[in-house]
Amino acid sequence: KVTVIGTELPKLDIMHTEWMHADCLADYYHVEVFSEEHWKLLENYFQEYVKRDCNMMLTPLFTSPLDTAIGLERTTCQLIDVEVKDGEYVFGFEKLKRWIDLCKKCGIEYFEMSHLFSQWGAKYAPKVVATVNGKKEKIFGWHTPAVGEYTKFLESFLPQLTAKLREWEIADVTYFHISD
């Protein structure tokens, strides 16, 4: 016998994440990553995600290195635009801001920044695509170690990212995933 009680559970007082991969949605529905169709799908999924008491969202700064065999890669899905100009890295945060705003609109309270290093020992960089001399190019991935030029990249990127998180008043509810 089951008794149904007409009440709602209180709001969770813990962070709860279930990894939702934006690239998988694009692949499944055959839409371009971060096209307007994709953003609408993301909104629908975010709303359902919150209904299931999830309140922290995996945020794909760069293409996730998760669940991918060494040497293979997932569909490119990065919220950060990267350009290499005169040997320096220039970052665009517009898509990340749109993601954050959409998450908040749907009731997501916490943000888990995607993995900064590969699985299985953090030996490699995640896939990062940049505009180099006017063309899109994979500048990091399985072919690049997690040290060297990638360290220079992070030294340029992370201070700018954390400044944006403070500006958007979400630094205190943002967590960084290093590796699995």
Regions found by a protein language model. Give the residues of each.
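Aromatic-lined carbohydrate-binding surfaces of glycoside hydrolases
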Residues: 1-180
